[in-house]
Regions:
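Substrate/ligand-engaging "lid" and interaction regions
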Residues: 1-42, 46-432
Length: 433
């Protein structure tokens, strides 16, 4: 079986492989998207394909949307050429349950993948056409926190950013300059409203996106490359909003065991590829089942019915409280503790650590005894239920190929936020028992 528009016409074969198919016609969806795009997403990698695209799939399956998502890649163009194009932008999603079973579904809600490359005139024009469409409601992002950075570790502007600031919208290479260039195209087409929604796993992500885009725009204005009114447009949150969000879903690199299962089931061309930018990516995505997305509800041009797809829509304070709950008490401190001790004790699997009674006692103490008494309750997600799921389902899942070595990366930069807030607020009197 092939993963493509023609391939999924083999409904009998897909049914035999126990793979759910989209309940809509991909070609018609792609046509509707080309006519009236609603949603463009920057960052065409696994978290987008395995989580965000699935949200739109739910809406399409339920008849709550007609168009799909346009994926734009600013960093690794090989992803488009080697993964999107051969498979009609479809993804074989494999959800890994704690009991060892899997749930498989073809995610077909991505209408097209575009290389956000100003040197490729045709691709650049396609992206510009999307951004100048009055129908466009949102641009979302999963480009990692590094994707927003304009400066190096010394605080100096990166050479590519300096070049972008000097050359203007037509020669934009850094991701933030590309975004600013697309907003300039939208401004020129009538200064239409849009929401710019960072969905990256970092605190105050919307503010990080806004600050970086505004710095590029301000430099262009200063250098006489764009009018000052464009800066006013981007700075007006009634027209260009930058909502905050909180995202949570473990989406590790493609696992060899999953590749083998899919090949044994009759699928062709499931092998991962390593791109020229060292991205490890496959036609399939494997990830855990639990997932959370909390988004500040500020969309000046309307939005898809995300609340009908399991997304929590709320105000900024609630987003921040949910992020604080996850990062400072209910998930990240537990993860970091396991990562550090896992490396020291020679473990190569988080799930294997959760079979060690002493390590389980450690994470339960950090979570339940130290964290929960001082947790920030966001009101939309129960901290107790969240941490129960982490300890009982997510961390012990042996089918999530996550390692303490990966999580331990940059621990020195994470200790303050992951443990410091609890240390500052906890009263240890309740620990004496």
């Amino acid at each position: 079986m092939k993963l493509s528009y023609q391939g999924i016409q083999d409904k009998q074969g897909y049914a035999a492989a126990q793979v759910a198919l989209p309940q809509y016609d991909w070609a018609k969806m792609a046509e509707k998207t080309a006519e009236k795009p609603v949603w463009v997403h920057f960052g065409a990698g696994n978290i987008f394909r395995g989580f965000i695209a699935g949200l739109q799939q739910r809406l399409l399956n339920a008849g709550l949307a007609e168009s799909g998502i346009v994926a734009a890649e600013t960093f690794d163009y090989d992803i488009i050429d080697k993964i999107y194009v051969p498979h009609d932008s479809m993804t074989l999603m494999v959800s890994l349950k704690a009991d060892g079973s899997t749930q498989k579904e073809v995610i077909a809600s991505i209408a097209k993948g575009i290389k956000a490359n100003c040197a490729d005139e045709a691709q650049w024009q396609q992206l510009t056409d999307v951004f100048t469409a009055p129908s466009l409601q949102m641009a979302s992002f999963t480009i990692t926190e590094k994707g927003y950075a304009l400066r190096n570790m010394k605080g100096e502007l990166m050479p590519v950013v300096v070049s972008d600031m000097e050359n203007g919208p037509k020669q934009a290479h850094h991701a933030m300059a590309v975004v600013a260039a697309m907003l300039y195209a939208r401004y020129q087409a009538g200064a239409m409203p849009i929401a710019m929604v960072s969905m990256d796993n970092c605190s105050h992500n919307g503010e990080k996106l806004r600050a970086s885009v505004m710095e590029i725009v301000a430099a262009w204005v200063k250098n006489g490359l764009v009018p000052a009114d464009f800066e006013a447009y981007v700075n007006d949150e009634a027209r260009v909003s930058f909502p905050w969000s909180m995202i949570d879903k473990i989406t590790p690199r493609p696992a060899e065991i999953i590749e083998k299962q899919l090949m044994d089931a009759g699928f062709e061309d499931m092998q991962p590829v390593i791109t020229s930018r060292n991205t490890y990516i496959a036609p399939f995505v494997n990830a855990e089942v639990p997932q959370y997305l909390v988004v500040e509800d500020r969309f000046p041009n309307g939005r898809p019915a995300l609340d009908k797809a399991g997304v929590y829509l709320c105000d900024r304070k609630t987003v921040n409280d949910t992020e604080r709950m996850k990062v400072t008490t209910c998930l990240n401190p537990l993860h970091t503790a396991l990562a550090v001790y896992g490396c020291l004790l020679g473990y190569t699997s988080i799930a294997a650590e959760m079979k060690d009674a002493e390590l389980v006692k450690l994470v339960k103490t950090i979570g339940y005894k130290e964290g929960l008494p001082v947790v920030t309750d966001p009101g939309i997600i129960s901290p107790k239920a969240f941490i129960d799921e982490v300890v009982e389902q997510r961390l012990p899942n042996p089918f999530i190929p996550d390692t303490p070595q990966r999580i331990a990366t940059d621990t020195s930069q994470k200790v303050g936020i992951r443990f410091g807030e609890t240390i500052k607020t906890v009263s240890y009197t309740h620990l004496r028992a």
